[in-house]
Amino acid sequence: MERSTNMSGRRRDHKNRILRNGESQRKDGRYAFKYVDTNGQVQFVYSWKLEKTDKLPAGKRDDISLREKEKMIQRDLLDGIVPHGGEMTVLQLVTKYVLQKTGVRHNTEAGYKTVINIITKESFGQQRIDKVKPSDARAWLIKLQKDGRSYSSIHSIRGVVRPAFQMAVDDDLIRKNPFEFQLATVIVNDSVTREAITRKQERAFLEFVKNDKHFAKYYEGIYILFKTGLRISEFVGLTIQDIDLQNRTINVNHQLQRTRTMEYIIEDTKTNAGTRILPMTDDVYECFKRILENRAKPKLEPMIGGKTGFLYLDKNGRPMVAMHWEKYFQHICQKYNRIYRVQMPKVTPHVCRHTYCSNMAKSGMNPKTLQYLMGHSDIGVTLNTYTHLSFEDAETELKRVANGE
């Protein structure tokens, strides 16, 4: 199998070049390098070329030379990198990463399962992790978008895969993370920004709801969403005990979610900053007062996670959840746009939150105060994500400052 030694005892290849320790040449001309990996196992690598400058034999598949491979192996051995990425595939790596993420919220857990299901169906998921290069990672994300996945969906997928590969780097399974690049430089951001609506549109929307025979019963709830900036999960989680009419405050310390299996659960607020006490304006106070006065007492108060007395119940006596309100908003917009020539843009509970934040910013509210009211852990979110200020807003503010107002 191996090239024999010469008179001096030095092993040579068929071109009479001296072979180093561990190197050999097979009878078919292919070179081999034998070494012991970090696990104490004997391994072999092969190449048709000894040096980078060697000519590739006719009909053979191109590959880097044996000595180039040796350099990479020696470097990995020196740095304690596990050979071949521990023979782990992308799917196995992501699964291992997800299994270590214990105690996460149910929405996060559902997101992890979705990512694993996607990777399971992709050939990329069967690739060995040490074989994945940045160009492979980019190509896969581009493929996902061509397959019809949205930017936000791909952003979520990468949000799981990238830290999984970082775990592999930290575990010395691979040397570099192939997903360390900006997503926007690879695929087109086709996501639609959820814009705040104007004050005029807000007034028209609320007026329409108030005067509509069917939707009027939701007016107070919708008004509160527009005037408090509450997350819809926080709003539907409010109970009678959370509404302090005497001190005119709203105690926000949890949220209500319904899982895909229709299980109702109480969770902590989205962030620590989400736990807050909000003051009521006079009109918000009146809305809460009417909600409590008009709330029909059910035969049996539902209890979710130790909480009872939810403000809005559905026809089955269960607490209303985000989906109920999203449907109400959808139907309101559809009916409005069937009646009026000037169309109302898409309004959702989250648009109410955007609109509240934008209106407060335009009114000159202190950013730290606004951050508290919104329940943002990072003021950058308050300033960059939720405030949609136009040129006209900037012009008005500049004139106000210039006039010393």
Region locations from a protein language model:
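Catalytic-site neighborhood detector that most strongly recognizes the C-terminal catalytic loop/helix
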Residues: 188, 196, 255-256, 374-399
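Conserved tyrosine-mediated DNA breakage-rejoining catalytic core shared by Y-recombinases
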Residues: 184, 238-296, 303
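DNA/chromatin major-groove-contacting recognition/catalytic segments
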Residues: 261-266, 363, 384, 388-405
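Short, Arg/Lys-rich segments that mark the N-terminal edge of DNA/RNA- and chromatin-recognition modules
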Residues: 1-51, 254
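N-terminal core-binding DNA-recognition domain of tyrosine site-specific recombinases/integrases
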Residues: 55-62, 86, 98-173, 191, ...
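N-terminal DNA-binding module of tyrosine recombinases/phage integrases
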Residues: 26-31, 37-135, 293-307
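Short, basic (Lys/Arg/His-rich) helix/loop patches that form interaction surfaces
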Residues: 20, 147, 151, 207-218, ...
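Basic, Lys/Arg- and aromatic-enriched nucleic-acid-binding interface segment
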Residues: 155-157, 170, 174-176, 180-238, ...
